[in-house]
């Protein structure tokens, strides 16, 4: 693009340093908005279809500010590939198994029974368990070695545990929370008065036909 080349050359002359044009994105739509944050440290472009009036432009500018602040990875859940979802689930499962204290009580009780019956615990940990097993702060009385042993037992019994409905509910709840954090439309809108309105609901309140089609977020030093 000749205009872009000339603009780039002009900026190079003004700054007095050699610049390299490392990346760019072309964004098109019925409505496009941009936002620059931190003196140029973060730049955002966002595009939408379905509306192009002033209200839509203001809404997209607000959403661009949201993207700069919250750094979502996707616009909607539907944009996340099946492979990425499967990877997220596997990581979440392993994370839960490596944190026995967070496991549902029936599963945890089973792990404790195996640890005691298999003499996995040291004498001190076995005694602490017997004395404090009804204490909700039981894990405060166990050594790190005992906690590690429980995690190893959980991982060894992974195939059976993942079939447990309670465990699956725990995993799905954690995944849902993660997806809300990385998906723009599911994030709480940062300017919402009640702190609960999602970006999706905010856009619908402005214009039900306004649909985001693309977002771009660049940050200085990113990807280098």
Where are these regions (language model features)?
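N-terminal assembly/interaction segments in proteins that build large macromolecular machines
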Residues: 1-224
């Amino acid at each position: 693009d000749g205009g872009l080349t000339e603009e780039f050359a002009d900026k190079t002359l003004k700054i007095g340093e050699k610049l390299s044009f490392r990346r760019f994105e072309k964004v098109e739509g019925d409505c496009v908005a941009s936002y620059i944050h931190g003196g140029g440290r973060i730049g955002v472009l966002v595009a939408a279809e379905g509306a192009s009036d002033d209200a839509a432009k203001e809404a997209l500018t607000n959403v661009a500010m949201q993207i700069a602040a919250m750094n979502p990875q996707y616009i909607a859940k539907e944009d996340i590939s099946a492979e990425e979802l499967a990877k997220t689930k596997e990581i979440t499962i392993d994370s839960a198994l490596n944190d026995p204290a967070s496991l549902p009580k029936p599963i945890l009780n089973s792990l404790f029974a195996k640890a005691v019956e298999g003499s996995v615990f040291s004498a001190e940990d076995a005694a602490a368990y017997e004395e404090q097993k009804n204490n909700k702060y039981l894990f405060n009385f166990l050594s790190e070695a005992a906690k590690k042993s429980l995690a190893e037992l959980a991982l060894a019994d992974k195939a059976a545990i993942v079939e447990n409905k309670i465990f699956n509910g725990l995993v799905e709840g954690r995944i849902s929370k993660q997806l809300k954090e990385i998906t723009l439309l599911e994030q709480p809108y940062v300017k919402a008065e009640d702190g609960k309105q999602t970006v999706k609901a905010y856009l619908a309140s402005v214009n039900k036909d306004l649909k985001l089609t693309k977002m771009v977020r660049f940050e200085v030093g990113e990807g280098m």
